[in-house]
Amino acid sequence: MTEVFTIKQCLDGEISIDETVTVRGWVKTRRDSKAGLSFISLHDGSCFSPIQIVATDQLSNYHKEVTKLTAGCSMVATGKLVASQGKGQFFEIQAESIEVVGWVENPDTYPIQAKRHTLEFLREVAHLRPRTNTISAVTRVRHSLAQAIHRFYHEQGFFWVHTPIITASDCEGAGEMFRVSTLDLLNIPKNDKGQIDFSKDFFGRETFLTVSGQLNVEAYCMAMSKVYTFGPTFRAENSNTSRHLAEFWMIEPEIAFANLEDICKLSQSMLRYLCKTVLEERADDMDFFNQFVAPGCIERMEHIADSEFEMMTYTDAIKALEASDQKFEFPVSWGLDLQSEHERYLAEVLCKKPVIVTNYPQEIKGFYMRLNDDGKTVAAMDVLAPGIGEIIGGSQREERLEILDRRMDECNLNKEHYQWYRDLRRYGTVPHAGFGLGFERLISYVTGVSNVRDVIPFPRTPGHADY
């Protein structure tokens, strides 16, 4: 039996010329010549480029099946791998047999025709869009970045912690959470006050889908020293923008005996490592993005990989913005959060490279961030990148129980719900720090695909959960 190879193996020169191979995949296009030949472009997802299958009318099923192949049909081809005579390809397969595995019903209505489709249209056929050049390339880049993240942290001595999806804690304190319940919606139990009685629910209390794994991973940080979580998070935020998803993935490292400077260094090392990796491992996909989606994206990745990030405090950033001649849509004032236009000005115009802004006013940051000695700012950091703005947000955590309690009171958080988190400050507390990186935002930045709905397999957004 002939060995089955991927198209990537065939095109990468791993197989000797004139060796008989079997490949499997889906038809992208087929064209016929008057000389009794069919040229089939076949892809299997293993790399960006398809491989050409040359079929002659000597095949037993040539007229009955081969000439009826259309885009989307699945097939198995066996034949000799030879040097290609055509332009733009080094190898092709001279078919000795073709087996049609699956036909496309009604080819005229098949959604993924051999033409360029808008990303908006492809969201309507999310189950078929991985068959397109753009989405398959995004998927391979997503894979390489995910693998690189795990590899980076493993090499740095971190342990991957699987934090829970279902939680009773709101890390962000914003309240935009999806409730998890098995209560009968037609017969909801009530307590003496007429409120929903969550003690009758599955977990015996009110529970939600997690908005972040940070609080949980902090617990493991207090025993394992260097940990990270990489998993799905959920926000019930009714935002229909190119930057928001209701379900997305987060990378959240946490380091014990660490301060703000430590995570600033870690974030820079990680981003530089990821940019180098994707350029090395996904060169063909990045060439596609650079040519057809976001010209200059390769140069941008090279720039980040080679740059020393700029550092500035929030206060200095505000001064620089106020001193600039740029007209901003949103006001600039100490105490207000930086908007995307401010972030991009700092990274693209002022610094012309990634910049890490530190020490933000406590009022605009999370309750868990460490209060600085000035009593006004917290030891927070945001990494701002040219072309996108904020890509990483983090902080040194508040390890002093009395100050953490005060911040929770100021944020109107119920301390009873955070008893276990407060315990971490009671039993062997240490300075510790971490950050969060939205995975989809990273992929969007790397590929230049501007809408995060197009870099996750099945996007979850307000009004959309069809698959």
From Swiss-Prot:
It is found in: Cytoplasm. GO terms for biological process: asparaginyl-tRNA aminoacylation. Pfam families: tRNA-synt_2, tRNA_anti-codon. HAMAP family: Asn_tRNA_synth (MF_00534). Belongs to the class-II aminoacyl-tRNA synthetase family. InterPro entries: Aa-tRNA-synt_II (IPR004364), aa-tRNA-synth_II (IPR006195), aa-tRNA-synth_II/BPL/LPL (IPR045864), Asn-tRNA-ligase (IPR004522), Asp/Asn-tRNA-synth_IIb (IPR002312), NA-bd_OB-fold (IPR012340), NA-bd_OB_tRNA (IPR004365). It comes from the Bacteria. It comes from Legionella pneumophila (strain Corby). It catalyses: tRNA(Asn) + L-asparagine + ATP = L-asparaginyl-tRNA(Asn) + AMP + diphosphate + H(+). One of its GO terms (cellular component) is cytoplasm. PROSITE patterns: AA_TRNA_LIGASE_II. GO terms for molecular function: asparagine-tRNA ligase activity; ATP binding; nucleic acid binding. The keyword Protein biosynthesis applies. Its EC number is 6.1.1.22. This is Asparagine--tRNA ligase. Keywords: Aminoacyl-tRNA synthetase, ATP-binding, Cytoplasm, Ligase, Nucleotide-binding, Protein biosynthesis. Homodimer. Disulfide bonds: none annotated.
